[in-house]
């Protein structure tokens, strides 16, 4: 806070220049009007010094209106003008001058305070503190404080001193709070000084020791570098020797040692040396690498030759494989050579060719007996008590069975031998599985052609179906056995499958040839006569074939494919029917159509009776039944036409069906009204028809049964009789209704009476009730 100095108000207030108080500087213009407005609002309740001095002459600003202010202003101006004119205004001017001087000085001070860059909150706090202090003092103290004389100046200086002492007291209290900390800091200062002295001494010693240790470290570093370099050279030489050279003992093992684990370990090391020499070839001088490679290659090739020679020698003598140690060594040789296919394939081919030759020679001796074409003795692998397989003209089935059994035993022995060679009896060893299959197939391939030729020779000369089927069953059985033993891709398995096709084709050929012979043979054509019975050849044909088919338990005959099975069924069922129909159609013995239908029906009935027990022919049974049903319908129609002709109703039956065919579902008499226009449709004609009906039907059943005596199936006979009489009675009933409508005529016998005469009243009654 700025205080008004005493010197400001010490001068005398007279009319002269020396007696007048010095005028203050004009008030500062506040740059921001809004701030002055705000301060005026804040200080609205503050009492100005002028107001304090002139309490009697002024009023609060909030009680004076604007009009009153204007009036007061003009009134004062009028009074001042009068006083000047009368000369009485001198004293008032002096007082106004003093008051104006005080106000001007105070305004200057306030402007300086208010124009300071203080925030509103700070100013508010300052005035609040002043207000609190003024509230504690007496009213006269505030008046003395703002007094412009010596008293005011002294009051303000005292007030300023009080504020300063209070400020010093507050600052002293704050400093007293930091006094313990200052003491601690002084104690720390003493300790730090001691530490600094120790630090200086220590640094001096360290600097001296550092110079000495630097020299020592340099000497140690030189020694370590020399040691490391010497060790590196030593390690390089040792590593080079281990990586690129063989010692004398290892060379001895490869050149002259036994083939064992040590040999193969040393050989693997020699191969690694050979591979690692590629690094030496990248040097500026590759001569060292070339020399090492040449030497290692020489030793490796010599070792491989020893392995190949040992393997061929061991495989050439099968008895040597009884030694487990030799077999283990052979197994190691195979493991090593399996990555060198040229050597391995050469060994496998040599072994396969030698074993194939032995098997073929042994097979020929077994088939041909002790006789040898080349004059050579028996093989050492064949025992002296072995039984040769002789070809028997009377028992080809046994020969084929023995032949296949021998080949199967040979294949099993060879497969087990080769498996034991490559796996050493360990069934879980699958490393050489494909090789075992390949070698076994190559060895047994030599037997494929001889066995195929022998079996084809027997099958091609055999004419009995039963024998061929037995041979087929044997071949199929051994196909399963070979497949289980050798897999599905073996050459022997393919050969056996071809033999199955040969047997199937031969059976097809024999049946086809037999049917062709029957078709073209005159005796079979002449076998047809008026007794209308099936020919003997069909009985003989099925007596050979059906027992064979009946024994089959597979889904198809002879395990044929669905297409081939359908062809075979057509061959044994449809082809005989076709041949028989051709014979009947070209035979002039049968003059009546009814006889042709009956003999065909009897033939189909025989085939049906033969094929029903055979489950594989169930589809053909249905097909034959359909053929019989068609023939039955034709015979039924013939019998119906015969009855209509006997009764004189045949023409009327045709006329009515021309108008609208009869139907069990719908019948309306009015539909048949056009029949009246027909000339044959007269009452006299139906009188004659009625007489014929009465004359024919008492014996109609007996006559029809006699005409169907040659039909073998009683079921078909009953079906023909019932259906023909049923159709006639239905026609008879409907015709009687038409006659009643358009001729006023009815038959003597009703439809039920006719049905009773022929014994179908029950069936007819049920049919009427359904309708």
UniProtKB/Swiss-Prot annotation:
Keywords: Golgi apparatus, Membrane, Protein transport, Transport. GO terms for cellular component: Golgi membrane; Golgi transport complex. It is a peripheral membrane protein. One of its GO terms (biological process) is intra-Golgi vesicle-mediated transport. It is found in: Golgi apparatus membrane. It comes from the Eukaryota. Acts as a component of the peripheral membrane COG complex that is involved in intra-Golgi protein trafficking. COG is located at the cis-Golgi, and regulates tethering of retrograde intra-Golgi vesicles and possibly a number of other membrane trafficking events. Belongs to the COG6 family. This is Conserved oligomeric Golgi complex subunit 6. It comes from Candida albicans (strain SC5314 / ATCC MYA-2876).
